[in-house]
Amino acid sequence: MKKVFLFLGVVLSSVLATAQEVEEPEFAGEVVVIRANETTAPLEKQISQSRSVLSTGAILTGIGKYRTQLQIVGCCSTVKLNNGESVKFIVRAVDNNTDPLAIIKIFKFESKPKYRRAEVASTNTFGTTKTNNLSYISFSAKRYGKSSYIITPSVTLEPGEYGITVSNPNAVDEKQTVVSAFAVEK
């Protein structure tokens, strides 16, 4: 009888060991990518800079645009995904009780040799202001673990540089925006 229980214990533990899930990221705001082949990697983390730009037309003639941009240093992310690859992301938040669409943003950057930028807001000379100008990528999300979400982009990501931000719904005044960056190769 002992041998039967021992055998069942070994079989059960081996089944549970192979069904082990990917761990949640350690800190709120961190993001891990799950690739199509089930391998994982933490995304590159960058502290963003806020940048304001006045168009040439506004400088020369007084008519033009004033833009606010989110900028991170470096042309390219160190985390590269293959074009057309099916991916999911595990995003750690403060908790997973908030609608993820309200706190998680996936967006595309404009990449230059020394930086990556995304327009956050713009105002023209005539007073029209647009906010939330980021090129958002839609996604579906489910709760994952104790305080994370597993998110799946709703569209195939085109080649380019991308960022994910996670805001804290409990904090009224966030001082710095941390961007988790990745790239989709051509």
Across the structure, where does each feature detected by a protein language model lie?
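Sec-dependent N-terminal signal peptides
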Residues: 4-13
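Sec/Tat signal peptide C-region and signal peptidase I cleavage site
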Residues: 15-19
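Primarily secretory-pathway and cell-envelope proteins
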Residues: 20-124, 168-186
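Surface-exposed coil/turn segments at beta-strand junctions on protein surfaces, enriched
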Residues: 82-84, 144, 157
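Extended, solvent-exposed segments with strong compositional bias
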Residues: 121-146
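Aromatic- and Gly/Pro-enriched, solvent-exposed loop/edge beta-strand patches characteristic
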Residues: 142, 148-150, 169
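A glycine-anchored, Pro-Gly-centered beta-turn/N-cap motif
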Residues: 147, 156-161, 165
